[in-house]
Amino acid sequence: MAVRECMAFFADVDACARVPPTALAFSKHEEFNSGAKKLGSFQAYCPHDCSAEDMGSSSFDVDDVHAIACLDIRLFNQDRHAGNLLVQRSTSEDEPSQLTLVPIDHGCCLPELEHMDETTFAWMQWPQAKLPFSAKIKAYVTSLDSFAQEEAMKQYIRPPAKALATLHVGTLLLKKCVAMGLTAFEMGQLLVRSSLAMPSPMECLVAQLKHLDPYSHIHLYLRVFEVALDKLVRRMFPRTTNVVCADNGWTIQQPTQQEFAARKSYAKVLLSSAA
């Protein structure tokens, strides 16, 4: 769990979601059951007023929620509840108070691909999750490169191979779904179980690819995964839409065949950066 806490910090490129600085630390104390050093994560303390469970979700900035949603989706977060979203309130004499969300507790991120049954996102119940991503968030997602992040991580920690595979798959999934016009809520529908006994669409997709080894052949796995994901998204959301803001409110635009054809293969983009 400690290593995954650090991986979440590295994955939050440019502190887009505001994950606090996190590092690994060894600790030893005479009161411990064992005299051996213990490894844990050490995270900068973030002063805060409360957590998201103490406030109405409509108070939060849309881009803040979307940035955290993108991080959670990439990491297949299995413990995102309102209690581990800290709320900071900034006050100014000239401006009304502003609320900022700070996500913590990422030890249950990046599960093995075969064990994603506990993926959960509190923000799926928030209205912001059903709104389209801004141009800023879209540009950020487009710039993500999990292979470059892997190299950066390896300079400081030893990330587990299975956690890295999940990061690569999650990054591809996020980039592909954002390009296809899905909202954070719709992506959540792909990853989160609708009932305890029913596997999520993502779990079913991974099960279909069990003949492939993502840990020793990640490049091949990503190529096959992208094709399967494309089919899954089109089946679940047959009229994949783009939502734009018009003068009279939110309107829906259907993508043209040319737009569908022009969409990139994000597996190729990721893999070219790893070459």
List each language-model region with its residue ranges.
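ATP-dependent kinase catalytic cores of phosphoinositide-metabolizing enzymes
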Residues: 1-78, 82-275
